[in-house]
Amino acid sequence: MVKLLKVARLQFLIVGLSLYVLGALVAVVLGAPFSLGRLLVGYLVILPAQLSVHFSNDYFDVAYDRPGGPTLISGGGGVLLEHPELREPVKWIAIGLILFSIAVGIFFIRIYAFPWWIMGFVVLGNLVGWCYSAPPFRLSQRGLGELCYTFAAGFLVPAMGYLTMRGALDTGGMFFLVPLILYGLVSILSVEIPDMEDDRLGNKRTWVAVRGRGFGFMVIGWLLLAVTGYFFFFHRFYPRQLPLDFRIVGYLSLLPLLPGLLGMIKKPAEKQPAAKIATWIVITLAVFSIFVDGYLLYLASRLL
């Protein structure tokens, strides 16, 4: 059981939860009624889907894991290298989690009378997570892994949170999803930076494996600058008044921007210093999301 929990990488669930809650709180702040039941049942769609990705990635990528290779933010868990007898159970756990996610999605739509097109999001999210590393698709080896991760983590997860409260994805929701999509791309590029050598050995055509760590840090830096600029300036062009102070969110976005700019300036080529900066970028992205959740929760509590 302990070994399977290591494969699950429970620490990464915090990011998924915070993004889901962020989407839900944005909907409430924009006027949607709050429902604890919808919030909890909706998360039972997201949680198994995210866990399934952790299990399926370890199962299909075991050939590319290296003993001692994993870092805090990247690399396989290493469990299946040491315990190959767990490979089949891990595969079936991943499949079972997908089926559970879809079943809860159907239950959610039936009990809360939501439109059935939302099931398209649920099925698509699970399909993308499976195809990320599973043959014959193996999107992570075809230069498509970044787009898949960005779509799933940066768009689908917070969008599902928004949908559970509002029941539709409107202009207000999309306005908030744009920076989260960019942050999703920052996150996956940061995770790829420590894995560059192993990905090249495994013929994974990740953007960092193909173009190098310097390229990864440059893209990350520009994306983080774009998000901070978005929070400080772009909201002025939104057609109606929004009930929050974007300067606060902009200041919070400086948390991931600072290590991002450090990586952009230094562009370390060696694994150890590069992994250190990439780790800080991922950690500060998570902290940013949690702090924004706190701010939105404060605003929502004043509206309830």
Give short role names for the model-derived ranges.
Residues 2, 77-168:
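Intramembrane alpha-helical segments
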Residues 21-22, 26-62, 119-130, 170-190:
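Membrane-embedded alpha-helical segments that form the functional core of polytopic membrane enzymes
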Residues 68-113, 205-240, 284:
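Multi-pass membrane catalytic core of lipid/isoprenoid biosynthesis enzymes
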